[in-house]
Amino acid sequence: MNIHYTLSVVSLLIVAGIAACDKEAPFRKVTYVTDVEPIVQQHCLECHAAGKEGAEKSGYLMDSYEAVMKGTKFGPVIVPDSSESSSLYLLVAGKADPSIHMPHGKAALSDEQITIIRLWIDKGAVKD
Protein backbone atom coordinates (compact mmCIF):
# COMPACT_ATOMS: atom_id res chain seq x y z
CA MET A 1 0.00 0.00 0.00
CA ASN A 2 1.32 3.42 -0.94
CA ILE A 3 2.37 5.52 2.09
CA HIS A 4 0.92 8.69 0.54
CA TYR A 5 -2.44 6.99 0.02
CA THR A 6 -2.45 5.72 3.61
CA LEU A 7 -1.59 9.15 5.00
CA SER A 8 -4.30 10.74 2.88
CA VAL A 9 -6.93 8.30 4.13
CA VAL A 10 -5.86 8.73 7.77
CA SER A 11 -5.90 12.53 7.43
CA LEU A 12 -9.36 12.43 5.89
CA LEU A 13 -10.66 10.22 8.71
CA ILE A 14 -9.21 12.56 11.35
CA VAL A 15 -10.83 15.61 9.75
CA ALA A 16 -14.15 13.78 9.41
CA GLY A 17 -13.98 12.68 13.04
CA ILE A 18 -13.32 16.21 14.27
CA ALA A 19 -16.19 17.57 12.19
CA ALA A 20 -18.54 14.87 13.51
CA CYS A 21 -17.65 15.77 17.11
CA ASP A 22 -18.64 19.40 16.60
CA LYS A 23 -22.38 18.89 17.15
CA GLU A 24 -22.95 22.58 17.80
CA ALA A 25 -21.73 23.83 14.44
CA PRO A 26 -24.99 24.37 12.58
CA PHE A 27 -24.96 24.32 8.81
CA ARG A 28 -27.79 26.83 8.67
CA LYS A 29 -28.70 30.05 10.38
CA VAL A 30 -30.70 29.70 13.62
CA THR A 31 -33.59 32.18 13.66
CA TYR A 32 -36.39 33.13 16.01
CA VAL A 33 -39.23 32.41 13.59
CA THR A 34 -37.95 29.04 12.40
CA ASP A 35 -36.23 27.64 15.47
CA VAL A 36 -37.01 29.51 18.69
CA GLU A 37 -40.65 30.53 18.28
CA PRO A 38 -41.90 26.90 18.26
CA ILE A 39 -40.10 26.33 21.58
CA VAL A 40 -41.60 29.51 23.04
CA GLN A 41 -45.08 28.53 21.88
CA GLN A 42 -44.78 25.05 23.35
CA HIS A 43 -43.10 25.89 26.67
CA CYS A 44 -43.45 29.58 27.52
CA LEU A 45 -46.77 31.06 26.44
CA GLU A 46 -48.73 29.13 29.04
CA CYS A 47 -47.37 31.65 31.57
CA HIS A 48 -45.87 34.49 29.51
CA ALA A 49 -48.88 35.67 27.49
CA ALA A 50 -51.12 38.63 28.32
CA GLY A 51 -53.04 38.07 31.55
CA LYS A 52 -51.03 35.00 32.57
CA GLU A 53 -49.18 34.67 35.88
CA GLY A 54 -45.63 34.81 34.52
CA ALA A 55 -46.39 37.90 32.47
CA GLU A 56 -48.11 39.59 35.42
CA LYS A 57 -45.27 38.92 37.87
CA SER A 58 -42.34 39.71 35.61
CA GLY A 59 -43.86 41.92 32.96
CA TYR A 60 -42.36 39.51 30.41
CA LEU A 61 -44.58 38.81 27.45
CA MET A 62 -43.33 36.26 24.94
CA ASP A 63 -46.09 36.44 22.36
CA SER A 64 -43.93 38.04 19.66
CA TYR A 65 -40.28 38.44 18.71
CA GLU A 66 -40.44 42.09 19.70
CA ALA A 67 -41.85 41.24 23.14
CA VAL A 68 -39.22 38.55 23.71
CA MET A 69 -36.47 41.03 22.84
CA LYS A 70 -37.99 43.81 24.97
CA GLY A 71 -37.60 41.78 28.14
CA THR A 72 -39.16 42.16 31.58
CA LYS A 73 -40.14 45.17 33.65
CA PHE A 74 -36.65 44.80 35.14
CA GLY A 75 -34.87 44.99 31.77
CA PRO A 76 -33.76 42.89 28.80
CA VAL A 77 -33.34 39.13 29.18
CA ILE A 78 -31.51 38.63 25.90
CA VAL A 79 -28.12 40.09 25.10
CA PRO A 80 -27.53 39.37 21.40
CA ASP A 81 -24.22 37.57 20.79
CA SER A 82 -23.88 36.56 24.47
CA SER A 83 -25.96 33.70 25.82
CA GLU A 84 -23.93 33.71 29.04
CA SER A 85 -25.12 37.30 29.65
CA SER A 86 -28.73 36.48 28.74
CA SER A 87 -31.13 35.69 31.57
CA LEU A 88 -33.41 33.72 29.26
CA TYR A 89 -30.65 31.26 28.40
CA LEU A 90 -29.38 31.03 31.99
CA LEU A 91 -32.90 30.28 33.27
CA VAL A 92 -33.73 27.55 30.74
CA ALA A 93 -30.25 26.02 30.95
CA GLY A 94 -30.44 25.64 34.73
CA LYS A 95 -27.56 28.07 35.29
CA ALA A 96 -29.53 30.38 37.59
CA ASP A 97 -31.22 30.03 40.97
CA PRO A 98 -33.17 26.73 40.81
CA SER A 99 -36.22 28.41 42.35
CA ILE A 100 -36.66 30.46 39.19
CA HIS A 101 -35.74 27.78 36.64
CA MET A 102 -37.85 28.05 33.49
CA PRO A 103 -40.27 26.77 32.53
CA HIS A 104 -41.33 27.18 36.16
CA GLY A 105 -42.83 24.06 37.68
CA LYS A 106 -42.60 22.17 34.39
CA ALA A 107 -40.19 19.72 32.80
CA ALA A 108 -36.95 21.27 31.62
CA LEU A 109 -36.38 21.97 27.95
CA SER A 110 -34.51 19.27 26.06
CA ASP A 111 -30.77 19.66 25.53
CA GLU A 112 -31.50 20.27 21.85
CA GLN A 113 -33.96 23.08 22.65
CA ILE A 114 -31.50 24.70 25.07
CA THR A 115 -28.77 24.48 22.43
CA ILE A 116 -31.05 26.10 19.85
CA ILE A 117 -31.73 29.03 22.20
CA ARG A 118 -28.03 29.40 23.01
CA LEU A 119 -26.98 29.32 19.36
CA TRP A 120 -29.75 31.77 18.41
CA ILE A 121 -28.59 34.26 21.04
CA ASP A 122 -24.87 33.74 20.30
CA LYS A 123 -25.51 34.33 16.59
CA GLY A 124 -27.22 37.68 17.21
CA ALA A 125 -30.78 36.70 18.24
CA VAL A 126 -32.10 37.45 14.75
CA LYS A 127 -35.79 37.29 13.86
CA ASP A 128 -35.45 35.61 10.47
Model segments located where?
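Bacterial N-terminal signal peptides that target proteins for export
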Residues: 1-9
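Aromatic- and Gly/Pro-enriched helix-to-coil junctions and flexible linker segments
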Residues: 19-128
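Bacterial N-terminal signal peptides
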Residues: 8-17
